[in-house]
């Protein structure tokens, strides 16, 4: 089941972050580093009730952050949709031990948007994060633009891609 995360989930979440970083390294993807995402990011997400986990028999196999906080660099993009009130997907990871975890979490985000009458979902990823790009395309997201960003955690030497989906 997918549910809101709580503080008891933090250890599992940080372990999933480590696993995700290892997978990213296999793709020469340096999107996540020692500072991002940090435990403090997830504590804030839990407090804001925006972090969801995929929990199967009390084991956490993935997480996703769904909120309405758009990165400031989104303002530099000419979006073909109205971004007001859009959901934004941040920090998504699924365990190698649960095939399809990221897909289930992404479908949950779309279902949550429908449930709350949200008509647009925005997200972004690093140019080297091919698995995320494939997931976005699988769900019918459209790539809008790519932006070079010069501040942490986005200063990675390659652009970030911005995506949207009308719901």
Regions found by a protein language model. Give the residues of each.
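Conserved GNAT-fold acetyl-CoA-binding loop/helix
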Residues: 21-43
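Conserved GNAT acetyl-CoA-binding A-motif
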Residues: 113-125
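C-terminal "cap" of GNAT-fold acetyltransferases
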Residues: 83, 149-167
